[in-house]
Amino acid sequence: MRILLSNDDGVHAPGIQTLAKALREFADVQVVAPDRNRSGASNSLTLESSLRTFTFENGDIAVQMGTPTDCVYLGVNALMRPRPDIVVSGINAGPNLGDDVIYSGTVAAAMEGRHLGFPALAVSLDGHKHYDTAAAVTCSILRALCKEPLRTGRILNINVPDLPLDQIKGIRVTRCGTRHPADQVIPQQDPRGNTLYWIGPPGGKCDAGPGTDFAAVDEGYVSITPLHVDLTAHSAQDVVSDWLNSVGVGTQW
């Protein structure tokens, strides 16, 4: 198995390094990751400037000022030959639950892999301690995919409780919950009196009941949420069409 491994925490982050070490025990792994933390970069792609790469002695590649999407795009189309069999993103330092997937660079890297035609996993740890647990879970899933490919055409967003492996209760297939909208902005002043703004923390849990990714992780289970790239709200198409007809938009200007 050939794995393209990326993240949004940066090439030196403990999550990606722990996962790379574990994956290399049974797979051919190429790390292509940002040279710094790009959390919250979502699906952004660098278009107005060039991208420079640096290759370390162990073969890992850092993309200077690159986003997670840049890294996967370059990895698939230029840096990994032969091309990968699968794209893996993580292990993220902190969860990507509910609405987090909108902003997450970790999920975006996996989404880019799927968009380019490859199976893709996004892996996040609900904390900053037991990366070895998340690595073991990821390796188990990848070994299973080797034996029997999962042909859903979906991204698997995997969130792992920050617990020792022997305390993980199992795996649940979940849906995304939701958070309350985030509304905190933290102002500061620089030494010259100019105002600076920091984006505040995410909103608290809103829809976090049974069946959600939040609930699974809170109860000690690994959460796997299938995600897809197509953002079309198919069930709303007829509603929008009927509304346009009723208000006359498109028939008179």
Swiss-Prot record:
<feature type="binding site">
    <location>
        <position position="39"/>
    </location>
    <ligand>
        <name>a divalent metal cation</name>
    </ligand>
</feature>
<keyword id="KW-0460">Magnesium</keyword>
<dbReference type="GO" id="GO:0000166">
    <property type="term" value="F:nucleotide binding"/>
</dbReference>
<comment type="similarity">
    <text>Belongs to the SurE nucleotidase family.</text>
</comment>
<dbReference type="GO" id="GO:0005737">
    <property type="term" value="C:cytoplasm"/>
</dbReference>
<keyword id="KW-0464">Manganese</keyword>
<keyword id="KW-0170">Cobalt</keyword>
<feature type="binding site">
    <location>
        <position position="92"/>
    </location>
    <ligand>
        <name>a divalent metal cation</name>
    </ligand>
</feature>
<dbReference type="GO" id="GO:0008254">
    <property type="term" value="F:3'-nucleotidase activity"/>
</dbReference>
<dbReference type="InterPro" id="IPR036523">
    <property type="entry name" value="SurE-like_sf"/>
</dbReference>
<dbReference type="GO" id="GO:0050484">
    <property type="term" value="F:GMP 5'-nucleotidase activity"/>
</dbReference>
<keyword id="KW-0378">Hydrolase</keyword>
<keyword id="KW-0862">Zinc</keyword>
<dbReference type="GO" id="GO:0008253">
    <property type="term" value="F:5'-nucleotidase activity"/>
</dbReference>
<dbReference type="GO" id="GO:0046050">
    <property type="term" value="P:UMP catabolic process"/>
</dbReference>
<keyword id="KW-0479">Metal-binding</keyword>
<dbReference type="GO" id="GO:0004309">
    <property type="term" value="F:exopolyphosphatase activity"/>
</dbReference>
<dbReference type="GO" id="GO:0030145">
    <property type="term" value="F:manganese ion binding"/>
</dbReference>
<feature type="binding site">
    <location>
        <position position="8"/>
    </location>
    <ligand>
        <name>a divalent metal cation</name>
    </ligand>
</feature>
<dbReference type="InterPro" id="IPR002828">
    <property type="entry name" value="SurE-like_Pase/nucleotidase"/>
</dbReference>
<dbReference type="Pfam" id="PF01975">
    <property type="entry name" value="SurE"/>
</dbReference>
<comment type="function">
    <text>Nucleotidase with a broad substrate specificity as it can dephosphorylate various ribo- and deoxyribonucleoside 5'-monophosphates and ribonucleoside 3'-monophosphates with highest affinity to 3'-AMP. Also hydrolyzes polyphosphate (exopolyphosphatase activity) with the preference for short-chain-length substrates (P20-25). Might be involved in the regulation of dNTP and NTP pools, and in the turnover of 3'-mononucleotides produced by numerous intracellular RNases (T1, T2, and F) during the degradation of various RNAs.</text>
</comment>
<feature type="binding site">
    <location>
        <position position="9"/>
    </location>
    <ligand>
        <name>a divalent metal cation</name>
    </ligand>
</feature>
<keyword id="KW-0547">Nucleotide-binding</keyword>
<keyword id="KW-0533">Nickel</keyword>
<dbReference type="InterPro" id="IPR030048">
    <property type="entry name" value="SurE"/>
</dbReference>
<keyword id="KW-0963">Cytoplasm</keyword>
<protein>
    <recommendedName>
        <fullName>5'/3'-nucleotidase SurE</fullName>
        <ecNumber>3.1.3.5</ecNumber>
        <ecNumber>3.1.3.6</ecNumber>
        <ecNumber>3.6.1.11</ecNumber>
    </recommendedName>
</protein>
<comment type="subunit">
    <text>Monomer and homooligomer in solution. The oligomeric complex consists of at least four subunits.</text>
</comment>
